[in-house]
Amino acid sequence: TVPLKPDFVQDVNPVISKLGCNAGTCHGAKDGKNGFKLSLRGYDPLYDVRAFTDDLAGRRINFASPDDSLMLLKSTSAVPHEGGQRAKPGEPFYQILREWIAQGCVLDLKSAKASSIEVIPQNPVIQSIGDLQQLRVVAHFPDGTQRDVTREAFVESSNTEVASVNDVGLVSSIRRGEAPMLARYEGAYASTTITVMGDRSGFEWVDLKAFNKIDEAAMTKWKRMRILPSGLCSDTEFVRRLYLDLTGLPPSVASIRQFLDDPKPSGEKREMLIDQLVGNREFVDYWTNKWADLLQVNRKFLGPEGASLFRDWFRKEIEGNTPYDQFARQILTADGSNKENPAAAYYKILREPDLIMENTTHLFLATRFNCNKCHDHPFERWTQDQYYEMSAYFARVSFKADPTSKDKYIGGTAVEGRKPLYEIVYEKDEGEVTHLRTGKSAVPSFPYEADFDGNEKEGTRRNELASWMTSPDNAYFAKSYVNRIWGYLMGMGLIEPLDDIRAGNPPSNPELLEWLTQDFVESGFDARHLIRTICKSRVYQLSIETN
């Protein structure tokens, strides 16, 4: 049905989005299309209404004869339109646009967007390949009202080989498997996972011994999916796998013989080998290399001496098994000379507030904030305002030459300006980040809530950020590292890619990831405990041979 009085924010803008008019490939592009520009995906309603009613003396709107408005003539291809026909006269979308024009193109600035959406049903199972499943998208508004917005929402399949979905949320099953479905509506996002079961007649579950909670969570899903896992790998396979995963090196012939000749039960000696390798010199070297990649240790930015100092610093942290939250906090709050405090090299590498923020959120939270620098994130909840509010935490980071550098410099090319070998990182008393759209200084603010200890009025902005980011209550911090370690050891993360946590990219086993995250936090952010827990699971020790 067409609303009696269409509201631009809640009725018209969703239609414009669904028709594709404000997409990045159309009028939502940076410079618009053919002289007409809209805000990308409608994130700025005031700008869009003015574009329709004020630009070019208001030629796009005809209040006296709404059907003759260029806005409608273009969308119906009644006049030439490079974007083709987007709507037909008489259809609901057309009527909503027409009624809005007929009633004066009003914009109620107090009108609120949906605060959240939900997809119904949650995690449905399609029993037979070829069957259909209708999804509904329901929007919830701040005043407590809700309504079905399936027609206006976008629903997309993340695995089109398993299931596809049409414009009105009707899912078609293609083959056995799982397909995450992402629904988005006016900046709100929700997901569900479709399971296509297929013919599993004759399936019988065989009870298996769970080595720990990881196996219990995995078995719950195997039962639901009607899958029998592979058997355990042989001792020969296990010893090679473990050495490669924990030390990056194949075991020596002597190590293999010693393990195979040990008369102890297989399970017992496997646990002993895990405990033996976790924390040894080769283990420390291997995981130091991984962190060298993550922290971008590079002579180009630090010089040979600075790169060596930075690497030696976090090698000692890994060797001492520093809790992950403390490790991250030392980096985030680092100041002083990167010669005396090598952790400060993190800032010497990145330097600019926006680059520091993008890298920090990507590395420690597995979120991608670079997409919302120029506009609201098109496929996530992150906004352009949040980009600059987060960057503001690094706005006062500054650098000055460390006298111990003497006459040693790095860079000096046309691309890389010359900088002292060692620099002192410090926090200025002033300095702000300017918001691209508003031109005003951004006020530091977190993109989501997380309880943390600390007084906002004490310490630097980075201290406050570090307390928030490393909090046990932060939904992304521990989860992102747990998923990263799982991916390193298992070859694929519970979330893939490893550094892309978002609503439209749900974990393959949410219950397992939740338990692992909670266990990691309760262990005191002990990375070695996490690695041991994964390696001692039945899941880790399964054979590569298909059941």
Regions found by a protein language model. Give the residues of each.
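Solvent-exposed helix-loop boundary motif
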Residues: 1-4, 8-95, 111-138, 146-211, ...
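Protein kinase-like catalytic domain
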Residues: 16, 22, 27-30, 101, ...
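Short secondary-structure subsegments characteristic of cysteine-rich extracellular domains
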Residues: 86-98, 311-312, 505, 509
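A eukaryote-biased signal for short, well-structured alpha-helical docking elements
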Residues: 95-108
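Inter-heme linker and motif-flanking segments adjacent to c-type heme-binding CXXCH motifs
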Residues: 106-109, 143-145, 189, 378-382
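Acidic surface patches and DE-rich sequence motifs
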Residues: 141, 166, 435
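Primarily short, surface-exposed interaction patches in extracytoplasmic proteins
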Residues: 206-282, 287-547
